[in-house]
Amino acid sequence: MAQCVQTTTILEQKEEKTVTLLVPQAGKRKFEIVYFNIITFAYWHIAGLYGLYLCFTSTKWATVLFSFFLFVVAEVGVTAGSHRLWSHKTYKAKLPLQILLMVMNSLAFQNTVIDWVRDHRLHHKYSDTDADPHNASRGFFYSHVGWLLVRKHPDVKKRGKEIDISDIYNNPVLRFQKKYAIPFIGAVCFVLPTLIPVYGWGETWTNAWHVAMLRYIMNLNVTFLVNSAAHIYGKRPYDKKILPSQNIAVSIATFGEGFHNYHHVFPWDYRAAELGNNSLNFPTKFIDFFAWIGWAYDLKTVSKEMIKQRSKRTGDGTNLWGLEDVDTPEDLKNTKGE
């Protein structure tokens, strides 16, 4: 496979220099409601739920299958693109793959990649504190969607200005998306998914639009689950002192982003999980494929020994879905990494 994995020595040095996260906290604050956002999110979800109803009553099967395909494409655009490539730089991508991922990410419409990366790097640096945009210490609803319905916490504004995203601003592909955000993202996320069923196989405008909205809110909410459910429910086999958890349900919904305790301990691993090539981690397979054809390279991983030592030192003792799980077959434990 055409990939260059970072050496264990470098990774171990990075591990030793990792700054301990602040203790999860949520100080008292007065929420300033953004009514425009509430109305917008309410419409999206009402329209999406109506789209779900139409799927069972009048929508053509071609439209349903097309929307599911777009759901998968958009989700990979977020996980393999804005998350693993641009936020954490877990691998490098040549221009064709960057363009492809930018378009796929636009289909998800979760702000521009530049804004997404800024918020996500802030989230990792100040995870589950008042400087975290979607602080899970404030509960499920706030970390899931509530943070988007109110003004940003002062600490988020202050710390956000200190986050280095110069590498992202210097990327011409992402600058294009930022400059033409409204027409470009609007066309990719809403217009084309509506027009294609109408002109492609004679779907009604009502069905096409509302099923497109259903696909959109599904993409939103499965991503939101990483911020909420995967920070509240689950085991913590790698670091028991942080909120991010291993949540299998979230992994299924997001195609592999629910191994969140691992990800917060080893954010530079392109697999975002210890067992990165299992069936729940489609973005890893996506990246591996493009590494095979030469569009992705310098894939970074973590050594098994490093994972084992960190788990023993700071984990909660569960170590589910890991090589130290007592139920893991011996032949898997003895398998050598790539």
From Swiss-Prot:
Question: Which terms does the UniProt entry file under GO BP?
Answer: fatty acid metabolic process; pheromone biosynthetic process; unsaturated fatty acid biosynthetic process
List, alphabetically, the GO terms of the cellular component aspect: endoplasmic reticulum membrane
Q: What is the main EC category here?
A: oxidoreductase
Reply yes or no: does the keyword Membrane apply.
yes
Catalytic activity entry = an 11,12-saturated fatty acyl-CoA + 2 Fe(II)-[cytochrome b5] + O2 + 2 H(+) = an (11Z)-Delta(11)-fatty acyl-CoA + 2 Fe(III)-[cytochrome b5] + 2 H2O
Alphabetized UniProt keyword annotations: Fatty acid biosynthesis, Fatty acid metabolism, Iron, Lipid biosynthesis, Lipid metabolism, Membrane, Metal-binding, Oxidoreductase, Transmembrane, Transmembrane helix
- Record InterPro entries: Acyl-CoA_DS, FA_desaturase_dom, FADS-1_CS
Q: In which tissues is it expressed?
A: Detected in the pheromone gland.
The sequence motif named Histidine box-2 is recorded at 120-124
What domain of life? Answer: Eukaryota
Membrane topology term: Multi-pass membrane protein
What are the TM regions of this chain, as residue ranges?
33-53, 61-81, 97-117, 181-201, 212-234
Short sequence motif Histidine box-3: positions? 260-264
Which locations, inside or outside the cell, does it occupy?
A: Membrane
Region of interest called Disordered, as start-end residue ranges on this chain: 318-338
What is stated about domains? The histidine box domains may contain the active site and/or be involved in metal ion binding.
Protein name stated in the entry: Acyl-CoA Delta(11) desaturase
Q: From which source organism is this entry?
A: Spodoptera littoralis
